[in-house]
Regions:
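Active-site-proximal, substrate-binding regions of enzyme catalytic domains
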Residues: 2-177, 187-217
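Short beta-strand/turn micro-motifs composed of small residues
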Residues: 182-185
Length: 217
């Protein structure tokens, strides 16, 4: 695991960045080329890496050491466990389910899994979020590849986690000034865009914060 602090509760941050594995790989190469990655990330009050993505980062000792070195240099980089998203959503697990469903709304296998294994006719009968999320990750409906170090790499898990986290911040904290997603993956943009369109109908009485993107383009 990454040897960096864990983020558990929102503390009023107004400039938030979310980062995926592809961006970490790119920035590590930038650093090797003599360009300060730290300078590119200054200005955010918190930079978050979901735990599913931290597992991907740790597939490479170079990426792992790079992130830990940025933390040692003072950048506010934290990992966040997906099970703790419920705390960010004020414990409103029904709404959190809607956000998860929205994040996977373009993936038929994921939708089918949620309909069959998570949804109940009465939402009060659903298992706790942390329980059904853990089961979903253990029984991942999309393809799984075993990496050289023996880890099971679950297709699109990181992108889905980023989308869920972005939407939780967006819909629950209207005073946030900016949410920036660092990714080189087009899927992340598509998932988040579709999730936003879905949630506009689900959360008609809420105001959302826009999510912006940065890549190496």
């Amino acid at each position: 695991m990454l040897n960096i602090p864990e983020y558990r509760n929102y503390s009023g941050e107004t400039k938030i960045a979310l980062m995926d594995n592809s961006t970490v790989a790119f920035l590590e190469q930038v650093e090797r080329a003599g360009i300060s990655a730290k300078e590119l990330l200054i200005g955010y009050e918190v930079i978050l890496i979901p735990n599913w993505i931290s597992e991907e980062i740790c597939d490479s000792i170079y990426r792992k050491n790079f992130i830990e070195s940025l933390v040692a240099e003072g950048l506010p980089i934290y990992f966040i466990a997906e099970e703790n998203y419920t705390d960010l959503a004020n414990g409103e697990e029904g709404n959190l389910y809607k956000i998860v469903f929205a994040a996977v709304s373009t993936l038929a296998a994921m939708r089918s899994y949620l309909h069959r294994h998570v949804e109940k006719s009465d939402s009060l009968d659903m298992e706790e979020y942390a329980i059904w999320l853990s089961k979903m990750y253990q029984n991942w409906p999309l393809s799984i590849i075993t990496t050289k170090n023996g880890r099971e790499k679950k297709k699109n898990a990181g992108e889905i986690s980023l989308t869920i986290l972005a939407e939780v911040f967006s819909w629950y904290y209207p005073n946030i000034e900016s949410i920036t997603m660092y990714t080189q993956d087009r899927d992340s943009y598509d998932y988040q865009t579709n999730a936003r369109n879905y949630l506009r109908d689900a959360f008609k009485n809420k105001v959302s914060v826009d999510v912006s993107y940065k890549s190496n383009d």
